[in-house]
Amino acid sequence: MSTVPQIALVGCGYWGKNLCRNFHSLSALSAVVDATEIGHETARSIAPNVRVTKSFDNILADDQIHGVALATPAETHADFAFQAMKAGKDVFVEKPMALTLDDANEMKQVAHETNSILMVGHLLEYHPAVLKLREMIASGDLGKINYIYSNRLNFGKVRTEENALWSFAPHDVAVILRLIGEAPVEVSACGGS
């Protein structure tokens, strides 16, 4: 019988509470790290038997924890990911992966060097409609795809720590890349207020 890998969730706020619920329902949640008492209360209300702490270092030192899920502010993703991978943990990081291309490339390099799994939470890639579209494109049912238009609605929470591109575009870009399976030749964008 296989054992379920144990995950520590870092951040139990706006989006982290959803990850807390999901990992707990899978019996994969071993601990929750959050800097705030509100985060602790949220974690305990969702997963009452799970360890809740403010210490990320204790999580890194725990050999029973196989990976960490990062649901912290975007500007902290790279640092938490580096620490976790260097401690031998796999990392699931919410979007955006990082706020700079240099940080993203370094995260990828550290994952390679430490033989760690580094996964970004592009949840829309697994949506049934996206999977069906991918199947239709692969089978040729839609012909050759020359152009894709994306329009973002339902913006959700407005964030001040990252710009609109980092906040909203990662899911759209991830879905398009997954559907097409190749890099775009040209990209254009416009915005307004």
Where are these regions (language model features)?
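Alpha-helical elements of Rossmann-like donor-binding domains used by nucleotide-donor carbohydrate transfer enzymes
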Residues: 18, 42, 58, 67, ...
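Short, Asp-centered acidic motifs that coordinate Mg2+ and/or phosphate
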Residues: 31, 67, 147
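Beta-loop-alpha module in the N-terminal Rossmann-like domain of NAD(P)-dependent dehydrogenases
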Residues: 47-110
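Short loop/edge segments at beta-strand edges and connector loops
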Residues: 54, 93, 120, 188-191
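N-terminal Rossmann-like dinucleotide-binding module
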Residues: 1-47
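A contiguous active-site-proximal alpha/beta segment in oxidoreductase catalytic domains
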Residues: 75, 98-159, 172
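Rossmann-like dinucleotide-binding domain that binds NAD(P)(H)
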Residues: 155-193
